[in-house]
UniProtKB/Swiss-Prot annotation:
Database matches in Gene3D superfamilies: P-loop containing nucleotide triphosphate hydrolases
Keywords of the record: ATP-binding, Cytoplasm, DNA damage, DNA recombination, DNA repair, DNA-binding, Nucleotide-binding, SOS response
Binding site for ATP: 68-75
Subcellular location: Cytoplasm
Function: Can catalyze the hydrolysis of ATP in the presence of single-stranded DNA, the ATP-dependent uptake of single-stranded DNA by duplex DNA, and the ATP-dependent hybridization of homologous single-stranded DNAs. It interacts with LexA causing its activation and leading to its autocatalytic cleavage.
Source species, domain of life: Bacteria
The name this protein goes by in its record: Protein RecA
UniProt gene name: recA
Protein species of origin: Roseiflexus castenholzii (strain DSM 13941 / HLO8)
Pfam families: RecA (PF00154), RecA_C (PF21096)
Signal peptide segment: none
Chief location bin: cytoplasm
One Gene Ontology cellular component: cytosol
Family: Belongs to the RecA family.
Amino acid sequence: MALSPEKEKALAAAMSQIDRKYGKGSIMRMGEASSKLAIEVIPTGSIALDIALGVGGVPRGRVVEIYGPESSGKTTLAQHIIAEAQKMGGVAAFIDAEHAFDPVYAKRCGVDVDNLLVSQPDYGEQALEICETLVRSNAVDVVVVDSVAALVPRAEIEGDMGDSLPGLQARLMSQALRKLSGAISKSRVVVIFLNQLRLKIGVMFGSPETTTGGQALKFYASVRMDIRRIETLKNGQETIGSRTRVKVVKNKVAPPFRQAEFDIMHNEGISRAGNILDVGVELDIIRKSGAWFYLGEDRLGQGRENAKQFLNENPALADEIERLIRAHAMAAPISIAASKADDVVDDAGLFEE
């Protein structure tokens, strides 16, 4: 609806005043801002998860939470996101609150450890201040905080072992996210919080599992991913990796409740070749006949492991298949089973600010 000349003039004056007072771009028409508001992403290193996220990766300028049980692949997934950001020419930082960063394994996941920024803070406030400084620098593309459970408030560290300080960590997270959210959006950085699970005592109905750090992170996160190990992969008696399932339990940039499965191998992290095979078969780009895998009429190998090895030995072919998968999936997203409502972590019963 067209505005009258008087209203148009008054609106232009108001917008001009806001821009002068708060800076250019403080207010704008959506049509003018469409190019700035387009969702930019960083791939996750798993094409199945990129498809499940609906936009091809984790969105820039947003908070992302990855949670799950111990040894489920949280850090591995975060390191693959770091590796993808570095491949795109970006800078990544890893805030190691758990003091357990393994540079050898990170290198296997594709991380350029020589150019990775690593910090091992002494307490929670220091970790979050470092995170804020990096975000406000506008020079970093990914910041990973490992983990929320290890962000121990300074008062708790300086107190006695038996002191009860309920809600202290939740208040710390709530305050930090209030300060960080605007800066994260403006800087286009992805801030990834890794989180652990805890069990609530006395729960009779629903899931007894919950995450640490209060309620704030659940609200501020645009994407929340629940990662679980569902199967152990073996070569004879030797364990060589695990089959992992990720459920996107919250997604503000695409439909939620999709899920993805992929292999995490001990010697390489997320298996790219295995991922390409699985998704390629699901999309009918790769044909499976008996034990054989085919691309068109060309054989890729007999058995999944042989086909994976063939793709690893022919990276140009793997790149071409991945390009076909992305073109097909992004044009018409594949149907990925939604998780049941009771699979989502229940938020009730936590101290929060």
